[in-house]
Amino acid sequence: MRLSVALISSFQWKKRSSKAIMRRGRKRRRRRQRGEDFFVAPEIPLDLLIEILTRLPHKSLMRFKCVSKQWSSLIRSRFFSNRYLTVASPLRPHRLYISLVDHKCDSREVCHSPRESVLLSFSSPSSFDQDLTTMQGMGGLHMVTLRGLILYIVCGKACLYNPTTRQSVTLPAIKFNIFVQGNEHSLLYFLGHDPVLDQYKVVCTFVSSSSQDLETIISEHWVFVLEVGGSWKRIEFDQPHTPTRSGLCIGGVIYYLAFTSMFQDIVVTFDVRSEEFNIIQAPLVLSAYVDSLDFIEYGGKPAIFYHTSLKENGLVDLWVLENAGNWSRTVLSLQPCQLHLVDNDIPLTLVDTTQNGEVVLVPSDLCSPFYILYYDIQKNHLRKVEIQAMPDHKKDGIKGIPDFGFKLMDKSESIIHLET
């Protein structure tokens, strides 16, 4: 009897379980049949997605590459990298870079001795303590910034660093043809961008001169295209010269100051796309040997900012290179009430210009407190910003009192992937 009751109970339980399973199956089928009535979120249009992503911080973009292959391909594409550069965002303040080097080995010289360096980055002098980023082994005395990239020299080799992605690339060494034992040798690298073909190129000028007769100068020039499989290519140019500045690139043309074997001051131009050099006569009153001048961008044109008289009488000469290759001169006179902002004891070095047209000047020596001068050419206004806490170079791994280089990256965050 008990066995019969147990069998009946087991049968009823299985029956109820079967009915429950059937009911759940019917519900699933009904759900599948009504699936077309469910709300399906539409995909975000590509143009809207790009607009959203270009306004995000670079750290978010690096994480979002893991969302899908489509997002990864989009973020890594050259189109998106260029779009990201052009979008102005309040989340991207300009950044200041100070490079400390452990000894006075001029990075323009051909040397092979190891050295230590550290690159310090902060968004503004007021946030130096809170927003200081330290990058060991990066930077140099002669740095070039362009479209979010930093070019510097380490023992004769050109190095590129993207502070946004933290990617660094060291270009191969060049086998120069004019290396003469016993001569003085120097080299300088330039960074250019061709907006038509969207190509980045590094230009190297190597100079060999007699140590006894500096009037005898021979030079050779090399170009490296930043692309997969890139290599150094020699460019012929029959005008030997010695560069004295790192120059700047405007509209696909690199401009830099130099002098010839006859100690004639010239301006050298290099067309990034055609890879052709040209020479323009510099203003006769200027000298390439003077430290108190350099190229700036003024109104979309290259201009020489000559500030040798800024400390004494508050005067600045601005020489603008016009389309016809002629120079136009403007004399700027600082307001008398602002002359006290300039320290007469320490020479000033021109760093760069901001997107607002302010010329950035810094002392040529590490002083305490260290300060930055912002000179607004349009308003003829000078302001001084002090950095209360300069970095402790001993704490940062730099022994002794280092030399330093200073550069400005004005709201340019590049997510381009460097390939060579």
Curated annotation (Swiss-Prot):
In what residue span(s) does the F-box domain sit? 38-87
Q: What CDD domains does the entry give? A: F-box_AtFBW1-like (cd22157)
Q: Which Pfam families match?
A: F-box (PF00646), FBA_3 (PF08268)
The domain of life for this entry's organism is: Eukaryota
Tell me which InterPro entries the record gives. F-box-assoc_dom_typ3 (IPR013187), F-box-assoc_interact_dom (IPR017451), F-box-like_dom_sf (IPR036047), F-box_dom (IPR001810)
**What's the protein called, per UniProt?**
F-box protein At5g62510
Q: Which organism is it from?
A: Arabidopsis thaliana (Mouse-ear cress)
Query: Lineage of the native species?
Result: Eukaryota, Viridiplantae, Streptophyta, Embryophyta, Tracheophyta
